[in-house]
Amino acid sequence: MSGREGGKKKPLKAPKKEQSEMDEDTAAFKAKQKEQQKALEAAKQKATKGGPLLQGGIKKSGKK
């Protein structure tokens, strides 16, 4: 390579891959993940609905 050759040899962005068809195992796995995500979101909403459990915060002693 001579000093005058500049730039990158590889393109900055890789070409997009074609979306391959999913087999049954992959489809079942993705469906299971979606169900788990929905259950997690429902649990989060249920947990935040009740309000904070502790109001204490950081306890400070009387000493300095």
UniProtKB/Swiss-Prot annotation:
Region (Disordered): 1-64
Keywords: Coiled coil
Superkingdom: Eukaryota
Sequence similarity: Belongs to the TMA7 family.
Coiled coil: 21-50
Organism of provenance: Anopheles gambiae (African malaria mosquito)
Biased composition (Basic and acidic residues): 32-44
Name under which the protein is recorded: Translation machinery-associated protein 7 homolog
InterPro entries the UniProt entry points to: TMA7
Organism lineage string: Eukaryota, Metazoa, Ecdysozoa, Arthropoda, Hexapoda
Pfam family, one: TMA7
